Structures are given as structure tokens and as C-alpha cells.
């Protein structure tokens, strides 16, 4: 589930490299480093290698760099990683290496980028949303639904251990899922939003980033409990404005949850509205303005967005 989120991007650029799962906060790599720490490897080694390892997996997410000569035989290059992200039959489940390409050559998963097969990016079951929260949990929710719907006990159990894309026969027949059969017929997800709505989305994203840093800055003052609720507020906020860009009515419901979270925090602190600190005033004012903005765009653009999305699905 967690790597599908990274691959759900239908473009291949540096922004794609930043599309990571929420569960990345609990990284398997950190667990695997515990034995090294126990054996006495200095902490500065981890501090040095961490950023290097991160950058070495970041830079090759680009279509602008062609093949790199002899380096193609040593390190993972943009060409190698374009193959890894391709949904073409020739490229599926290939080039898993992160830094040194030798591992794919040793385990039989290496594939060179073919001149006559241009990689098509994304996933075989398109996410079809701009909402990162939905993208994070969509595949997991599908597994839960399939496990519940299948009639065979054995399928309810093994679905959690089968390869990606596997579904019980009875569920696949009764509840078909849109899957890309021919990569070159892929229709990239697109919503025909007005410039005003796109501008609203950019403003919302910018404010969310500022409020995120503000939450970090004020964490010592608020403590873990309140900081946790403010983090939840930010996640619901992202859910709200990306759902609005998707043309979904439940974006307004998410705005209601935002206001409820802030009201709970105010109630928990046992202070009146007039005595709120600046941080809380900003969060409350933003929640109200954001909700009014959602109401406006739902009223003026929802019919237009739904019409465009239906025509795209056809």
C-alpha cells in the first residue's frame, strides 16, 4: 500500500519523488539500523548517511536526463527509475534498486529502458483524485472491502499476503474495478477547474504550510495533546480543499470537522473567545473563512466540475 502512493503520480518529475506515504513516519530502514546502533556504530554515521541516501533516491525522478553512459552499469539512473515507474507490461516489477543497480542484475529484475517503449507512469488502478489522504488509504480500503465481501474464508485470509493486484474471483466478478489494460490508452486524471478555484487551492496549500510550521513552533507551549489535535486539523484541512478541487460535496463536511476540532481545543483550554492566544485566533478565523470559501465554490462550480468529470470518465 505505501509504495503505491509514490507510484500513483501520473507524471515523472522531482515532485513525484516527494509523493510519499503517511506511514513513512515509521520507516523500516530505521528498524533495520537498530542492530548497527547496538553494535556501536556512531550516531554521526547515521546522520551523514541518512541525507545522502535520501538525495540518491530523489534526483533520478526526472525525464530530462537521458542515459548516462558507463554510470548505467553502476548506479540507479533516471533511465533505470523511469522503467521502475512504468506501467507498461515490459516494465512492471523491474528495477527495484535504490542506489546501486547491481542488485536488480543479481536478482533478475533488471530491465533497460527500451527506445521503442516509452514509459507510461501511474498505477494500473488509477487513484483519480487530488486528495492525498484518499490516495494514502484507497488501496487499503479496497483490500478491507474485498476481504469482507468474498464468501470464502481462505480468500479472506490470503488476500493480505497475495501479490499486489490480486483479488478473490467472486469479488472481482461481482465488483469490477477500472484497470488500465493498455498503458498507451491511459487517460490522466484531470479536473477542469476555474482559475479562481485553482488560486484558492494554492492559497489554501500555502496557508496550510505556514500553519504547519506554526504548529511546530508552538508545540512546546501547547503540549503533545493539543499539538496532536492541531496536526489532525491540518490533515482534515488538506482533505477539504483537495476534495473541493475534485468537486466533492463532502469537502464542506471536512470544513465542519475543522471547526469542531478548534472548538474542542478552545474548550479543553478552558478559555473564552476573547482570551484566545494569537495562534488559536488564527486557526479559528482561518476555519471560518475556509468554510465560507468552500460554500462559495460548491455553489458556483460544483455542477461545472461534475459535468467535466463525467465526460472524462466516458
Where are these regions (language model features)?
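Short alpha-helical linear motifs
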Residues: 69-76, 94, 141-145, 278-282
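Short, highly charged, low-complexity non-transmembrane loops/tails of multi-pass membrane proteins
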Residues: 77, 304-314
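A short structural micro-motif
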Residues: 54-55, 167, 263
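Short, charged cytosolic
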Residues: 1-4, 158-182
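Substrate-recognition/cap regions that form aromatic- and gly/pro-loop-enriched pockets
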Residues: 189-276, 280-306
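Membrane-embedded catalytic scaffold of the fatty acid hydroxylase/desaturase
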Residues: 1-132
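A membrane-cytosol interface segment of integral membrane proteins
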Residues: 118-166
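Membrane interfacial helix-start motif at the N-side
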Residues: 9-22, 180-201
Amino acid at each position: 500500500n505505501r509504495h503505491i502512493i509514490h507510484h500513483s503520480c501520473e507524471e515523472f518529475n522531482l515532485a513525484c519523488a516527494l509523493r510519499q506515504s503517511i506511514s513513512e513516519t515509521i520507516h523500516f530502514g530505521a528498524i533495520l539500523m537498530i542492530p548497527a546502533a547496538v553494535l556501536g556504530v556512531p550516531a554521526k554515521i547515521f546522520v551523514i548517511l541518512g541525507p545522502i541516501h535520501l538525495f540518491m533516491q530523489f534526483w533520478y525522478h526526472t525525464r530530462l536526463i537521458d542515459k548516462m553512459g558507463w554510470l548505467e552499469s553502476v548506479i540507479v539512473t533516471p533511465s533505470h527509475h523511469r522503467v521502475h515507474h512504468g506501467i507498461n507490461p515490459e516494465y512492471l516489477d523491474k528495477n527495484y534498486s535504490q542506489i546501486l543497480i547491481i542488485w536488480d542484475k543479481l536478482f533478475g529484475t533488471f530491465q533497460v529502458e527500451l527506445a521503442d517503449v516509452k514509459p507510461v507512469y501511474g498505477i494500473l488502478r488509477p487513484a483519480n483524485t487530488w486528495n492525498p489522504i484518499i490516495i494514502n488509504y484507497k488501496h487499503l480500503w479496497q483490500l478491507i472491502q474485498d476481504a469482507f465481501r468474498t464468501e470464502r474464508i481462505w480468500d479472506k485470509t490470503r488476500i493480505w499476503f497475495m501479490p499486489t493486484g490480486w483479488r478473490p474471483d467472486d469479488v472481482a466478478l461481482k465488483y469490477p474495478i477500472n484497470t488500465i489494460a493498455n498503458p498507451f490508452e491511459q487517460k490522466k486524471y484531470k479536473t477542469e477547474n476555474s482559475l479562481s478555484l485553482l488560486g484558492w487551492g494554492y492559497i489554501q496549500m500555502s496557508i496550510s504550510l505556514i500553519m504547519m510550521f506554526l504548529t511546530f513552533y508552538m508545540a512546546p507551549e501547547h503540549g503533545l495533546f493539543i499539538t496532536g489535535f492541531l496536526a489532525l486539523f491540518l490533515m482534515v484541512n488538506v482533505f477539504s480543499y483537495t476534495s473541493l478541487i475534485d468537486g466533492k460535496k463532502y469537502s464542506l463536511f471536512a470544513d465542519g470537522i475543522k471547526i469542531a476540532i478548534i472548538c474542542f481545543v478552545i474548550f479543553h483550554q478552558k478559555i473564552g473567545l476573547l482570551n484566545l492566544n494569537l495562534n488559536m485566533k488564527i486557526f479559528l478565523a482561518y476555519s471560518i473563512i475556509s468554510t465560507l470559501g468552500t460554500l462559495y465554490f460548491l455553489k458556483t462550480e460544483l455542477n461545472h466540475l461534475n459535468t467535466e468529470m463525467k465526460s472524462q470518465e466516458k
